[in-house]
């Protein structure tokens, strides 16, 4: 996070900074929330939502803070002004948040606002007053001295220092219900069960969850082990570590024949590859060659529009954000509109839900229709494809690579020697050397 913040403040390639006027006070080196989001999008090539989430994490960790509504540590993609926190208050510096410092901070706020603290700050103030009562005169003296020194600064500097201190204590002493990033970390959510009210409704929900858990069907260990054995026996021949590679392992022999025979769009697939199509419908769709042969089968059965619709939905789901409206309109005109050339057959409820979502198109608007068509092909077309002559012919015509030299476990292979070991050489027999008169004549 610190590297990101330092890059943001780069004078050449960082975020554009400007002076921000708050009423009659001018705050220098301020940045707009919109500029922060745009910089993160361009820097890391991410979506706007992801950039907004990353910026919010930076704010929650105290690396940036808002000049307006300073208690709200979230990033807004608008003209809301923000400033970068000084490195002295960064969480990585591990500056200990001592109780004495927190008491001085609360005492300053109490003097400035004449006792108008937030509820949880009042509780902390009273608790600290009891805990360090022996040094409370020192706390008040330090608070008044810091306020006296602050009056010598410009109003803009006083506002900046006040926001910096408030952001630091919001991170180190968060309000009740807010995420404590120093304990939970950025990967956890803002859910904090310690602040939940243990009411009767809470216990009713707990009892209902336990009842559902008791009524849930449990799978026996014998059934699980049987499923594991079936899966292992089915996938064992296809595991290159356990069964080796045919014709050879390219990482050992430097022979790329294995990669060439298993290319994504090879003309003649191997037998192991064709056999994997029968494992599951997802295996068939994930293989470009298998999907092409499945499309040929569906064309013969006059239902190729189902697979075409599924492919169009996949393109919409993983395509660019700028092309979403165009792709949604194209899919609707081709597959869903009344009298469409490749109209698909889905139930009325799914059609109503899909048409309602098309009013505000997004990349997941066709998920319900895509799932319906997927299950239709999985339960109807896929079993008939495995029993068809097309699949049987592919199995018969599939390529079976010839084994050159296979090492299922390369780490068990013995090292090669340039010359045989002397211990393995047999001593020459004397009769064989002297029995031939021709040999004697030759010498």
Swiss-Prot record:
Pfam families: DEP, G-gamma, RGS, RGS_DHEX. The keyword Nuclease does not apply. Residues 280-395 form the RGS domain. Residues 418-437 have a biased composition (Polar residues). Inhibits signal transduction by increasing the GTPase activity of G protein alpha subunits thereby driving them into their inactive GDP-bound form. Heterodimer with Gbeta5. Interacts with RGS7BP, leading to regulate the subcellular location of the heterodimer formed with Gbeta5. InterPro entries: DEP_dom (IPR000591), G-protein_gamma-like_dom (IPR015898), GGL_sf (IPR036284), RGS (IPR016137), RGS6/7/9/11 (IPR047016), RGS6/7/9/11_DHEX_sf (IPR047017), RGS_DHEX (IPR040759), RGS_sf (IPR036305). PANTHER family: LP21163P (PTHR45746), REGULATOR OF G-PROTEIN SIGNALING 11 (PTHR45746:SF3). One of its GO terms (molecular function) is GTPase activator activity. Residues 11-86 form the DEP domain. The keyword Flavoprotein does not apply. This is Regulator of G-protein signaling 11. GO terms for biological process: G protein-coupled receptor signaling pathway; intracellular signal transduction; negative regulation of signal transduction; regulation of G protein-coupled receptor signaling pathway. SMART domains: DEP (SM00049), G_gamma (SM01224), GGL (SM00224), RGS (SM00315). Residues 418-443 are annotated as: Disordered. It comes from Mus musculus (Mouse). Residues 198-259 form the G protein gamma domain. GO terms for cellular component: cell tip; dendrite; dendrite terminus; protein-containing complex.
